[in-house]
Amino acid sequence: MTVRIAINGFGRIGRNVVRALYESGRRAEITVVAINELADAAGMAHLLKYDTSHGRFAWEVRHEREQLFVGDDVIRILHERTLADLPWRELGVDVVLDCTGVYGNREHGEAHIAAGAKKVLFSHPGSNDLDATVVFGVNQNQLRAEHRIVSNASCTTNCIIPVIKLLDDAYGIESGTVTTIHSAMNDQQVIDAYHSDLRRTRAASQSIIPVDTKLAAGITRIFPQFNDRFEAIAVRVPTINVTAIDLSVTVKKPVKASEVNQLLQKAAQGAFHGIVDYTESPLVSIDFNHDPHSAIVDGTQTRVSGAHLIKTLVWCDNEWGFANRMLDTTLAMAAVGFRLDASASTKL
């Protein structure tokens, strides 16, 4: 069965989802039937074809009136401001990928479903009242047909959760801290300008800028046993893509750095193949641009102090890796089937 998807919001993640769909060879499994975006069709086509981070798109892209052509495929372009006006029923949409970054609670999900979509996948953590939050590679097997409104978590949650799981399963995590070293984003300023967050009033290209993060809450949403046992901070740095995460955990069992690396490398080659990668090459952030993994462990940076404090450095392409996981989760949602009885919904 080919899953019919619509994309709401054609920004960084929305465009990368389309690119990843075609570049990963999953076009036979997923068809994009519509994209809803307030920008004009010319701008949408141009930014799909030319991307500063990811280069030129290999497929031919053009637009004609309110249609976007990718190769031989035709995608309908919409410019609806109100979710209730979206023609998902008319278009036979199975799953809406809401990549706006604006919508993310149950009411928004229900609006997509009322418009005719069978399921909704948000491209950010969303509210706690959604049916499920999925970190693909860790908990997607818990999805059920009645899970209609789902979050794909965040790029950083997808990056760090597999590593936390591996370390916890092997050594038993007692507590941890996370520092996200994240590339600049479009909620920052090119030059100094007003913002509700005074740190984000400053030019993104000229400073390392501390920002708020809900990553600790994202960790405990997937692993409730770590409630009040993880803390996180985040800084934005003057690069446009790729993120590094510094993870420090205190564990119950004594361990050596070489054993930690052996564990993570084995997982990358086995159970977490395609989700986690491992390297000991002397790489820098640009080398992970366009990497489809959720997490790439840098084995050269693993440290252990006092046999119980583990520090690791984990990289991710916060756009490309996450876009690929959006596609993985979409297929997982479709694979469990579509149950249209809203009263049957159970929370994951």
Swiss-Prot record:
Keywords: Cytoplasm, NAD, Oxidoreductase, Pyridoxine biosynthesis
Keyword Oxidoreductase: yes
Reactions the enzyme catalyzes: D-erythrose 4-phosphate + NAD(+) + H2O = 4-phospho-D-erythronate + NADH + 2 H(+)
EC number: 1.2.1.72
Site (Activates thiol group during catalysis): H182
Positions contributing to NAD(+) binding: R12, I13, R81, N318
Biological pathway: Cofactor biosynthesis; pyridoxine 5'-phosphate biosynthesis; pyridoxine 5'-phosphate from D-erythrose 4-phosphate: step 1/5
InterPro entries with a match to the protein in the record: E4P_DH_bac, GlycerAld/Erythrose_P_DH, GlycerAld_3-P_DH_AS, GlycerAld_3-P_DH_cat, GlycerAld_3-P_DH_NAD(P)-bd, Glyceraldehyde-3-P_DH_1, NAD(P)-bd_dom_sf
Organism domain of life: Bacteria
GO CC aspect terms: cytosol
GO molecular function, one term: glyceraldehyde-3-phosphate dehydrogenase (NAD+) (phosphorylating) activity
Residues the record marks as active site: C155
Residues reported in the UniProt entry to bind substrate: S154, C155, T156, R200, T213, K214, R236
Gene Ontology biological process terms in this record: glucose metabolic process; pyridoxal phosphate biosynthetic process; pyridoxine biosynthetic process
PANTHER family xrefs: GLYCERALDEHYDE-3-PHOSPHATE DEHYDROGENASE 2 (PTHR43148)
Function: Catalyzes the NAD-dependent conversion of D-erythrose 4-phosphate to 4-phosphoerythronate.
Family, per entry: Belongs to the glyceraldehyde-3-phosphate dehydrogenase family. Epd subfamily.
Subunit structure: Homotetramer.
Protein name: D-erythrose-4-phosphate dehydrogenase
Organism annotation: Salmonella typhimurium (strain LT2 / SGSC1412 / ATCC 700720)
